[in-house]
C-alpha cells in the first residue's frame, strides 16, 4: 500500500500547486508566528482556494491560546488540527470543542519514547525530539533512528515526520511501514521557502517506494 503524504508549511501558490499536481493527500499550513513558514489565516485561506476534497487541509498550531484555532477556522475551514507542545488532556478538550480530527505530535529520540496508545486523539505524529535549544518544535530537518520502528505496529493511526527528503523517504517508508509521511524542510530551497521541484520529487519517491 502506498503511503499517504502531507506537505507541511505551505506558504506560496506555487508550492500548493505542486503539492496538488503531484498527488499529496494532506496540505499543511503553519499558524505559529515564530516559524519561517507561518501564514496568517487570511493568507492560508487564499492559498487554499484551489484545494478540494478528497485533499485535506491541516492546520498546525503550537500550544494555542484559547480562541486561536477558532479565529483561523472563521477564515479557513480546516479538515484536521495538528497540535505541538500540547498535553493529551488539552488535545482532547480541543478535539471535543472543535469537532475536528486532531493529530498530536510526539517527540521521539529513543525506543522508550514510542507511544503505547494514542491517548484518544485521531493520530500521532512521530517527529524527532527537538534539541533543547531548538526554536521550533518541528520542521528542523532532524530525523530519529528509524530502526526503532522495525517492530512498531500500533493499533492507532500514526504519521512519520522528521528529516525526510526526496532521497530518504522511500527508504524510510520501506523500513518503517509508515502509513503517512510528513515533510517540510526536506522540500525547501532555503529555510521557509518550498521548492516545487523538490515537492514533485518527494511525491514521486513515495509512489515508487
Swiss-Prot record:
Record key words, sorted: Amino-acid biosynthesis, Aromatic amino acid biosynthesis, Isomerase, Tryptophan biosynthesis
Protein's UniProt keywords contain Amino-acid biosynthesis: yes
Keyword set includes Hydrolase: no
Pathway membership, UniProt: Amino-acid biosynthesis; L-tryptophan biosynthesis; L-tryptophan from chorismate: step 3/5
SUPFAM superfamilies per the UniProt record, alphabetical: Ribulose-phoshate binding barrel (SSF51366)
Gene3D superfamilies registered for this protein in UniProt: Aldolase class I
Pfam families: PRAI
InterPro entries on file: Aldolase_TIM (IPR013785), PRAI_dom (IPR001240), RibuloseP-bd_barrel (IPR011060), TrpF_fam (IPR044643)
Lineage: superkingdom: Bacteria
The reaction(s) this protein catalyses: N-(5-phospho-beta-D-ribosyl)anthranilate = 1-(2-carboxyphenylamino)-1-deoxy-D-ribulose 5-phosphate
Enzyme class: isomerase
One GO BP annotation of this record: L-tryptophan biosynthetic process
E.C. number: 5.3.1.24
Name listed for the protein in its UniProt record: N-(5'-phosphoribosyl)anthranilate isomerase
Organism: Granulibacter bethesdensis (strain ATCC BAA-1260 / CGDNIH1)
Lineage: Bacteria, Pseudomonadati, Pseudomonadota, Alphaproteobacteria, Acetobacterales
Amino acid at each position: 500500500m502506498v503511503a499517504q503524504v502531507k506537505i507541511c508549511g505551505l506558504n506560496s501558490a506555487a508550492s500548493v500547486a505542486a503539492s496538488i499536481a503531484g498527488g499529496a493527500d494532506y496540505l499543511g499550513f503553519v499558524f505559529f508566528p515564530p516559524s519561517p513558514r507561518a501564514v496568517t489565516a487570511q493568507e492560508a485561506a487564499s492559498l487554499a482556494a484551489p484545494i478540494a476534497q478528497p485533499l485535506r487541509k491541516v492546520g498546525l498550531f503550537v500550544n494555542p491560546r484559547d480562541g486561536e484555532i477558532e479565529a483561523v477556522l472563521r477564515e479557513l475551514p480546516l479538515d484536521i488540527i495538528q497540535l505541538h507542545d500540547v498535553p493529551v488532556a488539552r488535545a482532547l478538550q480541543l478535539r471535543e470543542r472543535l469537532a475536528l480530527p486532531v493529530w498530536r505530535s510526539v517527540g521521539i529520540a529513543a525506543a522508550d519514547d514510542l507511544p503505547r496508545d494514542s491517548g484518544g486523539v485521531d493520530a500521532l505524529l512521530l517527529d524527532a525530539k527537538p534539541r533543547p535549544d531548538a526554536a521550533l518544535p518541528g520542521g528542523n530537518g532532524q530525523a530519529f533512528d528509524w530502526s526503532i520502528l522495525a517492530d512498531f505496529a500500533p493499533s492507532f493511526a500514526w504519521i512519520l515526520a522528521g528529516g525526510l527528503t526526496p532521497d530518504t523517504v522511500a527508504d524510510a517508508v520501506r523500513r518503517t511501514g509508515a502509513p503517512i509521511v510528513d515533510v517540510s524542510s526536506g522540500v525547501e530551497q532555503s529555510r521557509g521557502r518550498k521548492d516545487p521541484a523538490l515537492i514533485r520529487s518527494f511525491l514521486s519517491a513515495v509512489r515508487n517506494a
